[in-house]
Amino acid sequence: MTLLKNDTFLRALLKQPVEYTPIWMMRQAGRYLPEYKATRAKAGSFLDLCKNTELATEVTIQPLERFDLDAAILFSDILTVPDAMGLGLYFAEGEGPKFKRAMQHEADIAKLHVPDMEKLQYVFDAVTSIRKALDGRVPLIGFSGSPFTLACYMVEGGGSKEFRTIKTMMYSRPDLLHKILDTNAQAVTAYLNAQIDAGAQAVQIFDTWGGVLSDAAFKEFSLKYIRQIVAGLKRESEGRRVPVIVFAKGGGLWLESMAQIGADALGLDWTCNIGEARRRVGNQVALQGNFDPSALFGTPESIRAEVARILADYGHGSGHVFNLGHGINQHADPEHAKILVDTVHELSRQYHGG
């Protein structure tokens, strides 16, 4: 086991004392980096990049070479799980992800089952390879989509603006949706545990579309299944706690409920005030966020001011991991991302220690 040279991220997630607020960025390995685009071109396609251990390792490490980040996140996609279930994932140019076989008929849903984790071996190989390449520099985060977010793509057959198909199923045949969600929850639990076995030192569950649901529907069709996953995860590996982060975009309404599902931290999108969020969840969980990704289009001065505001809103003490409130925009200037990272480190020290 390689000793971690920088474990600030893990300590902050567990609300242990830190010297500064750690930062990583959702989608930190991505299209805003010219070096990522070059590696992606070499791979041929996005899926080929995910499935090539060497290149997935390369793009995971790229942002760490450029910025002083406190964590790396596995380069992969949330839709690897339904792809392994046999839904036939493909990416249409300019249209995003699509599935050849959408889950819309009772007969198909009845046949849906947890995939053999061997079909996802390329992901676990990437985790092992990235850990080796990191050599203890910073922790590695593994991740998965939430059962509901995965179901959105599986039922709609791709991305959607209004989620009419899945919401029709939810209100007219909730039994079918529950079958999909339960299968997804079992699959995600096995998938994240296999990532932890391969070397992931923290895991994040992305509930990207939970925020489109009503209050009652969120609790029944999303939160219930995230809780099921959290209860089934390995929480210790290599002699350390493996923290679990739950990020629901648009989930600010449900922070109190989310704080009670057993996760170590909650991710916040940019619409929440982090100080209010801290008061609402009390001492139950750490918080991650929540810089508006669009604020990177501002000036260096405005970026610094926004960082200062978020740090001041959170206030003194540990339990805050700085991040964006959603993935970094592909048009963001890497120089502005560097200003963000360096400013967080510089301005946060006054809120720790002493």
Curated annotation (Swiss-Prot):
Transmembrane segments: none
Main location: cytoplasm
Annotated substrate binding sites: R27, Q28, A29, G30, R31, D77, Y153, T208, H326
InterPro entries: UROD/MetE-like_sf, Uroporphyrinogen_deCO2ase_HemE, Uroporphyrinogen_deCOase
Role played: Catalyzes the decarboxylation of four acetate groups of uroporphyrinogen-III to yield coproporphyrinogen-III.
E.C. code: 4.1.1.37
UniProt GO molecular function: uroporphyrinogen decarboxylase activity
Protein's UniProt name: Uroporphyrinogen decarboxylase
Organism: Neisseria meningitidis serogroup C / serotype 2a (strain ATCC 700532 / DSM 15464 / FAM18)
Subunit composition and interactions: Homodimer.
Catalysis: reaction(s): uroporphyrinogen III + 4 H(+) = coproporphyrinogen III + 4 CO2
Associated pathway: Porphyrin-containing compound metabolism; protoporphyrin-IX biosynthesis; coproporphyrinogen-III from 5-aminolevulinate: step 4/4
CC annotations in GO: cytosol
Keyword tags: Cytoplasm, Decarboxylase, Lyase, Porphyrin biosynthesis
